[in-house]
A protein has these predicted regions:
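Cys-His-centered catalytic/binding microenvironment captured across papain-like cysteine peptidases
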Residues: 1-88, 95-158
Length: 158
């Protein structure tokens, strides 16, 4: 028996002229009550640009990163190509316009118009002190704050 789920969007991504924001739909704006004080949020979004039957059936990806093995299972990647294109990004909060329901961030790796499914606060307790990763990605930044200066273009094969 197949389970189905009803998911509704709560807002959309805006990325215009180098300004990134999340605009909540009006009925979800009260969900921002007392969220100020969190410097980082986790944003759950739908990878609509890759939501095809073929991509949903892809479980093995051919060398998405230059230094990874020739084949990599989709669950070992953060690729949009996956059985359910549900993606998560941690964003830095620059400003929250509570009245408008708008969250400003320096960057989010989602396109304008991307549906937002959920927003959660990023808590310090989610950090992992002893985090191990495969050798092929050991050289990646260890901290979010270092990732902006990293040459990601030299890592990807797409």
């Amino acid at each position: 028996m197949e389970n189905t789920y009803k998911i509704q969007k709560i807002g959309k991504v805006n990325a215009e002229n180098g300004i990134y924001s999340i605009q909540l739909d009006k009925q979800f704006i009260p969900g921002l009550t007392n969220i100020s004080g969190f410097k980082y949020l986790q944003v759950v979004w739908w990878g609509h640009l890759y939501d095809t039957p073929q991509n949903r059936a892809s479980l093995i990806i051919d060398k998405p990163y230059k230094k990874c093995p020739d084949k990599l299972g989709v669950f070992g990647t953060r690729s949009e190509i996956r059985p359910n294109p549900i993606l998560i990004t941690t964003i830095q909060v620059m400003q929250i316009d509570m009245e408008a329901g708008k969250i400003y961030t320096p960057y989010i790796d989602a396109e304008t118009g991307t549906d937002i499914l959920d927003i959660k606060p990023y808590h310090m307790l989610e950090r992992i002190k002893d985090c191990d990763v495969p050798d092929w990605c050991q050289h990646w930044p260890k901290w979010y704050e270092e990732a902006g200066d990293f040459d990601w273009a030299d890592e990807f094969n797409f």
